Amino acid sequence: MKMIVGLGNIGPQYDNTRHNTGFMVVDAFAQQHGIALTTRKMDARFGSGLVNGEKVLVVKPTTFMNESGRAVHPIMDYFKIDVADVMVVQDDMDLPLGRIRLRDHGSAGGHNGIKSIIAHVGTQNFGRLKVGIAHPQQHTVVDYVLGKFTTDQRPVFNQAADRAVAALDDWVAGSDFMQLMNQYN
């Protein structure tokens, strides 16, 4: 079983904000594959389905971003999911808007959701799908990440989200991670 985790903050005030990029991508993936995130427990909403013959668990923590690990680790334990079968979808300010980047391990890079997952899971060796939101030009970081995409930014983000969903499809299908990085980064 593969586990795809989207990072974001809960509550309608955070819907469609840059920091909820992970939620938006996993929602698109789940919708494309008819996976309903109807189970609510272990500080998360999740659902599962078959994608290309592989069972996939799609997870959205219901904690705030900086406590995401509190949801991820218990779900991994409950479903006996190996860290090698986990992909976390996150926003990344260090990537230009519209770029995606896959990594098979690494530090949190200042992302508090990733930092929490590393702390709870006990390793940095899990997959990341980073979706670029760019650096703020005129806003503080907090105001920027909690703000919504502008009218000009939204189509660029939508294209990146489509590529991210395609990358998730290829990952679930068992594509070699190095090949995925070469194809999508």
UniProtKB/Swiss-Prot annotation:
Organism superkingdom: Bacteria
Molecular-function annotations in GO: peptidyl-tRNA hydrolase activity; tRNA binding
PROSITE patterns registered for this protein in UniProt: PEPT_TRNA_HYDROL_1 (PS01195), PEPT_TRNA_HYDROL_2 (PS01196)
Positions marked as site (Stabilizes the basic form of H active site to accept a proton): 91
Main location, first listed in the record: cytoplasm
Positions annotated to bind tRNA: 14, 64, 66, 112
Database matches in InterPro entries: Pept_tRNA_hydro (IPR001328), Pept_tRNA_hydro_CS (IPR018171), Pept_tRNA_hydro_sf (IPR036416)
UniProt keyword tRNA-binding present: yes
Keyword list, A-Z: Cytoplasm, Hydrolase, RNA-binding, tRNA-binding
Enzyme class, first EC level, given as a word: hydrolase
The protein's Enzyme Commission number: 3.1.1.29
Catalytic residues identified in the record: 19
Catalyzed reactions: an N-acyl-L-alpha-aminoacyl-tRNA + H2O = an N-acyl-L-amino acid + a tRNA + H(+)
Annotated site residues (Discriminates between blocked and unblocked aminoacyl-tRNA) in this chain: 9
HAMAP family xrefs: Pept_tRNA_hydro_bact
Function: Hydrolyzes ribosome-free peptidyl-tRNAs (with 1 or more amino acids incorporated), which drop off the ribosome during protein synthesis, or as a result of ribosome stalling.
Complex and partners: Monomer.
This protein's name: Peptidyl-tRNA hydrolase
Organism this protein belongs to: Levilactobacillus brevis (strain ATCC 367 / BCRC 12310 / CIP 105137 / JCM 1170 / LMG 11437 / NCIMB 947 / NCTC 947) (Lactobacillus brevis)
UniProt lineage: Bacteria, Bacillati, Bacillota, Bacilli, Lactobacillales
Gene: pth
